[in-house]
Amino acid sequence: QDWGGQSGGFLRMGITARSIAMGGGFTAELDQSFATFHNPAWAAFLIHRQLGSSYTNLTMDRRLAATSFATSLPPTAGVGVAWVFAGVNDIQGRYSTGMKSSKMQTGENALMITFAQRIVPWISIGANFKLLRYDLPITESDQISGSGIGFDIGLLIKAGTYSTLGIMVQDLSSNYQWNTNEIYTQGGPYKDEFPTI
């Protein structure tokens, strides 16, 4: 699918080496330390608290970082919170004359709050509520920020000791909303929609 160039790509990259190596197919598999990232319904089946942190240096001065915490909420629920950040630093700014100005950086942030509930002992549903923000430098003194909200919904069915079925819909209504009135004379509101997968 051609989702790479669309908004919110940092949420589709994968967080842990194991999940990336397995192609991101973790909807029905528990990703240790990042239990609710691939399917929020996992929070209702947790036995132990899950805490994880990840940092990755990527090419072209990009970086990806994440922190996650999830725990069961007895008797049949689970909660979690996670933060994912992606950004680029050391962007060389330029004046309109072409001369170098100061270095700038850009960054995308997602704060995810998770709740999951077991309906019966072997089925759970869960949701991630996302607060989204993108900070983008325009010039040395001007910066524009886009923000929005989004949701993930997941279902998990424990079909047996070694069999699990998972379904997840990622980035329902997720978007960045921008307003460029203060930066450009003909600016205005604009919305970048995330692809729903």
Q: Where is each model-derived feature located?
A:
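Outer-membrane beta-barrel porins/channels
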Residues: 1-23, 27-29, 48-50, 56, ...
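N-terminal periplasmic accessory domains that precede
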Residues: 34-45
